[in-house]
Amino acid sequence: MQILLAALVAYLIGSVSFAVVVSSVMGLADPRSYGSKNPGATNVLRSGNKKAAILTLVGDAFKGWIAVWLARHFGLPDVAIAWVAIAVFLGHLYPVFFRFQGGKGVATAAGVLLAVHPVLGLATALTWLIVAFFFRYSSLAALVAAVFAPVFDVFLFGMPGHNPIAWAVLAMSVLLVWRHRGNISKLLAGQESRIGDKKKAAADGGAQDGGKA
């Protein structure tokens, strides 16, 4: 019962879509209506409003971090923490408050990993930053980071074995790659947008709705 309650609370925390909330508060277009139509920081950046994108990134990462931190703070066992990690991640992917139309989970996963172990989170985030810096593809950076996160976990804590948190990290990585399946096709076809690109619809929306920021 304790695990179920913790997972439910985590799912509800994850269901808060900061991309939609921040955009609404700042008078910007709904990120689900332009660009990739993904409610995440990268798509919000396409509106031309960097402040909104940063707030979205921080908010999405924070909810992943706080869910796991609270589970640890209340002394829940590792199996409960593992379910909390997965639940907050699933909340972001399929938010009950937004008709189950969520983001791809990169920032939220990063927050979860930082709470699980700071070194694990930082190593994964650094991997994302390096790939994003050199290749300018947010999706490629996310995919590489997702692949390496379980590898970093093994280096830090050994093979998963009976460690439920390690299996949760692996599950999130698999889900994150699956959520990027459309991006994989675009990358292979050379049609993926680079970081900082503004599609016409997004640029128009940003000019009309986000020019005040």
Curated annotation (Swiss-Prot):
GO MF annotation terms: acyl-phosphate glycerol-3-phosphate acyltransferase activity
Broad enzyme group: transferase
Subcellular location: Cell inner membrane
Location (main, coarse): membrane
Keywords: Cell inner membrane, Cell membrane, Lipid biosynthesis, Lipid metabolism, Membrane, Phospholipid biosynthesis, Phospholipid metabolism, Transferase, Transmembrane, Transmembrane helix
Protein's job: Catalyzes the transfer of an acyl group from acyl-phosphate (acyl-PO(4)) to glycerol-3-phosphate (G3P) to form lysophosphatidic acid (LPA). This enzyme utilizes acyl-phosphate as fatty acyl donor, but not acyl-CoA or acyl-ACP.
Similarity annotation: Belongs to the PlsY family.
Membrane topology label: Multi-pass membrane protein
The species this protein was found in: Burkholderia cenocepacia (strain HI2424)
Quaternary context: Probably interacts with PlsX.
Membrane spanning stretches: 3-23, 51-71, 78-98, 115-135, 140-160
Associated pathway: Lipid metabolism; phospholipid metabolism
EC number: 2.3.1.275
A cellular-component GO term for this protein: plasma membrane
Biological processes annotated in GO: phospholipid biosynthetic process
Record-given protein name: Glycerol-3-phosphate acyltransferase
Reactions listed under catalytic activity: an acyl phosphate + sn-glycerol 3-phosphate = a 1-acyl-sn-glycero-3-phosphate + phosphate
